[in-house]
Amino acid sequence: MGDCWSRRRVVLAVAAALFLSSAAPVHAATEEAAVAPIQLLVDGLVEIMKAGPATPFQQRYATLAPIIDQTFDLSAILQESVGSFWAPLPPEQQAILTDAFRRYTVSSYVNSFDDYKGQRFEISPETRAVGNEQVVETKVIPKKGDRHELDYVMRQSSAGWRVVDVLADGSISRVAVQRSDFRRLLTRGGAQALAESLRTKSADLSDGSG
């Protein structure tokens, strides 16, 4: 009886070890795939920061826009921010909102990352799983002053891993903040009011050149 139990324990231990050894490469591959878009984004941000205010806003915008398209699932973010208002909208209004939201998102990043003063970015190679999503932790570290944490919530789509939310200081959801603002505008004036607000914000962020 004792020998039988010992053999069972050995078999179970070997099985567990085999499972863990096979699961580890899969998890590592998932982490690498989820982190890759954020590395692309950070490289783009550093590029426009080094270009700086001396480079026209629209030129920096043109540099970053395709990178945002490759790293963010803007459609998913917009729909999550708009919520139940989205489905009833005619396709043409959805397209208008999507275009305005894309311009606003890119303009926000170009405006926020507008000058390079020795800042560096740290991207954690290890992600944090939350349901079917992966959180990529990043830090913006200035030469002087406090560091800032920006965590990117990644979700896998047919196009690969894409950002579906950004957590400022590790907890403040950009989608949640937008949701309150967007739905208030939709309630008051519908899709047109939201689109106009996004266009106005984009123009303000770009000093009228957006």
Residues covered by each model-derived region:
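N-terminal export leaders
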Residues: 6-12
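Bacterial N-terminal signal peptides
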Residues: 13-22
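Early exported N-terminus immediately downstream of N-terminal targeting peptides
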Residues: 31-109
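Short beta-strand edge/turn micro-motifs at domain boundaries
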Residues: 147-177
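Low-complexity, intrinsically disordered terminal/linker segments enriched in charged
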Residues: 167-210
